[in-house]
Each structure stands twice: as C-alpha cells, then as structure tokens.
C-alpha cells in the first residue's frame, strides 16, 4: 500500500506514535497509535502535508464516522461515494484544496 509513498512520522519518547503516507496528492492513510489518539497527532501530520500540497485527496469508509468528522473539520469535502472492491466496503472520496 505505501511502497511508492512519501511517509512522514511523528515521534514521541523515541517511538513512532503516528505516520501519514502520501502518494503525490493522495493520502494513502493516517495512522496514530491507540494510546495517542485524540492528542492532536493526526492534525499535526495533516497540517504538515497541507503545507506541502495545493490539494489532497483520500478515501474513507462510510462507516468510519469519526474519521469523516475529522477530515471535514480539517476542510475536506465529500466528492463522491464508491465501493472498495478489495473489501466490499462503501467509501467516500474526499478532497481538500488550499485556500
């Protein structure tokens, strides 16, 4: 999944606590360790890549209401819905553009 991606990490106490994978303008994923969620790490990672890009795109499962809410707070807009063929899960494609 992340083989051709740029990966940026967040470290705390000499341990990786989160990372984001970016393939051009597409966010492959943002991951934060369970014990560090809701501490602002995801926002820090997202802000870092927002500074590098004019626009960003991602897919998120429709059932992941927490992630959808996070991305909407960060300025992402739902563009369309689709189906992840690998999992059969319904998903949204979301887009963010630099203002």
Describe each PLM feature range:
Residues 38-51, 69-73:
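Conserved acetyl-CoA-binding loop-helix of GNAT-fold acetyltransferases
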Residues 72-80:
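Conserved acetyl-CoA-binding loop of GNAT-fold acetyltransferases
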Residues 5-18:
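Conserved beta-hairpin
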Residues 27-37, 60-61:
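A short, internal acetyl-CoA/4′-phosphopantetheine-binding micro-motif in the GNAT/acyltransferase core
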Residues 20-28:
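Conserved donor-binding loop and adjoining core beta-sheet/short helix segment
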Residues 42, 46, 63-67, 83-90:
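Short glycine/proline-centered loop/turn elements that form peptide/ligand docking sites
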Residues 51-63:
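Conserved GNAT acetyl-CoA-binding A-motif
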